[in-house]
Amino acid sequence: MQRLPIEQYSALLAEKQQKLTELLAPFNSPPLDVFASETSHFRMRAEFRIWHEQDDFYHIMFDQKTKQRFRIDQFPIASQLINQMMLALLPLLKQHNILTHRLFQIDYLSTLSNKIIVSLLYHKTLNEEWLQAATQLKQQLIKQGFDVQIIGRANKQKICLQQDFVDEILPVKNQQYIYRQVENSFTQPNATVNCKMLEWAIDCTKNSQGDLLELYCGNGNFSIALAQNFRKVLATEIAKPSVSAAQFNIAANKIDNLHIIRMSAEDFTQAMNGVRAFNRLKGINLQDYQCNTIFVDPPRAGLDMATVKLVQNYERILYISCNPYTLCENLQELTKTHRIEKAALFDQFPYTEHMESGVWLIKKSN
């Protein structure tokens, strides 16, 4: 079992705080709001390769520096539920040769609502015999008290024993939000820190006037929680499974002022600028929206220059970043027109150098 340096957690977080403070200093950022993580069992998903050794097999990971493999029986950064499943699953898999033969990876996705998806990945075609054994495995796990979905994956094959999603329930500001999370789609890995991010975003946008535009909305994680602060919300997302999950989440949370369209941020920028018309915007009149606030949560590469220019047209910008270096590149442009009103560090990834951050920008008065 790996041991976490829990006694060093506060010092490691303070280092990140200092680093991010230094990075944001050229942009006249106010002091950071800092949101700590749980010190163990904070990660809601995990992926392991499977190593076969004679009649035995076990979870492994690879050391990023040495590339050496090491055995994992327990994984203290992963949720308690994932650790319980890791212990329960392997002995049951060993009872079914068809389930272990050419199995090379196991992915786990768990929720605070105590549900879990187990994805078994194979270098072989999955057949009826596999399905029967997997069904038996699922029943054995249910008998042990797990609320579990089993998925088999192989080349150009995906077999769901029931469904490929779990419904998460997140407590945010004395409310509970339901979020459908689809296997193999992006979800925030640290659920408790995600709740803190949502609460910070709600606080930033409190008493907002007008409407909100969100680019890269995923399963609606932010837009659903923020809808309460706006007259209307328009959100874009490119991944089909995420859009479907977002539509479910809108209905499940009884949100009636949020509309999601499936298109890239780049295409949406062209539509907003009137460069060309898009079929996907049929039935949506962009003129109906008075979006004076924009929310962006871009990939690690940050915003491309065309999107930066689009974003600068808005009175208020809420920017969540998973890469402080590309955030700072974008801020070199954004702070020409906007000032940083609030900034935050969210420790999504304890014991690593990764920093999740947020800035709330307000347009400078001329």
Curated annotation (Swiss-Prot):
GO terms for biological process: tRNA methylation. It comes from the Bacteria. GO terms for molecular function: rRNA binding; tRNA (uracil(54)-C5)-methyltransferase activity, S-adenosyl methionine-dependent; tRNA binding. Coiled coil: none annotated. Its EC number is 2.1.1.-, 2.1.1.35. PROSITE patterns: SAM_MT_RNA_M5U, TRMA_1, TRMA_2. It holds the Pfam family tRNA_U5-meth_tr. CDD domains: AdoMet_MTases. Keywords: Methyltransferase, S-adenosyl-L-methionine, Transferase, tRNA processing. It catalyses: uridine(54) in tRNA + S-adenosyl-L-methionine = 5-methyluridine(54) in tRNA + S-adenosyl-L-homocysteine + H(+); uridine(341) in tmRNA + S-adenosyl-L-methionine = 5-methyluridine(341) in tmRNA + S-adenosyl-L-homocysteine + H(+). The active site is at C322, E356. One of its GO terms (cellular component) is cytosol. S-adenosyl-L-methionine binds at Q188, Y216, N221, E237, D297. Dual-specificity methyltransferase that catalyzes the formation of 5-methyluridine at position 54 (m5U54) in all tRNAs, and that of position 341 (m5U341) in tmRNA (transfer-mRNA). NCBIfam families: trmA_only (TIGR02143). HAMAP family: RNA_methyltr_TrmA. Belongs to the class I-like SAM-binding methyltransferase superfamily. RNA M5U methyltransferase family. TrmA subfamily. This is tRNA/tmRNA (uracil-C(5))-methyltransferase. It comes from Histophilus somni (strain 129Pt) (Haemophilus somnus). The lineage of its organism: Bacteria, Pseudomonadati, Pseudomonadota, Gammaproteobacteria, Pasteurellales. The gene is trmA.
